[in-house]
A protein has these predicted regions:
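Solvent-exposed, non-transmembrane regions of membrane-associated and secreted proteins
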Residues: 6-155
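Sec-dependent N-terminal signal peptides
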Residues: 1-2
Length: 155
């Protein structure tokens, strides 16, 4: 099962991460979710929380921070992705600081809509999960814009 249709090389990079690498956590207050964020979107990452799409921006950085998560299996952090509203706040906690994003858009796309992973000049985060529930027919996508990045204070 693939999330999108990509070349074999791209799929291998995305799905065959050598080991689980935690890079922080994500908190979505409006749906009551806090879950770990891992590098890559392999099964090891998505079974334990959110996965950062390969070669996309790190949270708080310029570009598109693309996040995948399950709706109905494992930790299912995006079970209520369709309840996230425009204006809701999403927090990323990383070793370098806290990124605060505001939701600006939601949409439903086909599985081949790889454009949602493209990089931008803007500071955005794109979350996606299979849609409808218990189906892989479409993807539910939520886009958010960075409001503020607060670096961690050095000790």
């Amino acid at each position: 099962m693939s999330l999108f249709s990509f070349s074999v090389a791209t799929q291998a990079q995305a799905f065959n991460a050598p080991k689980l690498q935690n890079i922080g956590s994500i908190y979505i207050p409006s749906i009551g979710v806090t879950a770990p964020l891992h590098m890559g979107i392999g099964s090891a990452s998505l079974e334990k929380g959110f996965g950062l799409w390969p070669n996309t921006a790190l949270p708080g950085s310029r570009g598109n921070t693309v996040i995948a998560g399950h709706r109905t299996s494992h930790l299912r952090p995006l079970f209520y992705i369709d309840k996230i509203a425009i204006g809701d706040i999403i927090y990323f906690y990383t070793p370098t600081g806290t990124a605060k994003y505001k939701v600006t858009k939601h949409q439903i796309v086909k599985p081949r809509a790889v454009w949602i992973t493209r990089q931008t000049r803007a500071y955005i985060a794109t979350f996606f999960a299979c849609h409808p529930l218990r189906s892989t027919k479409e993807r539910y996508v939520v886009t958010a814009s960075l409001l503020k990045f607060t670096p961690k204070k050095k000790r």
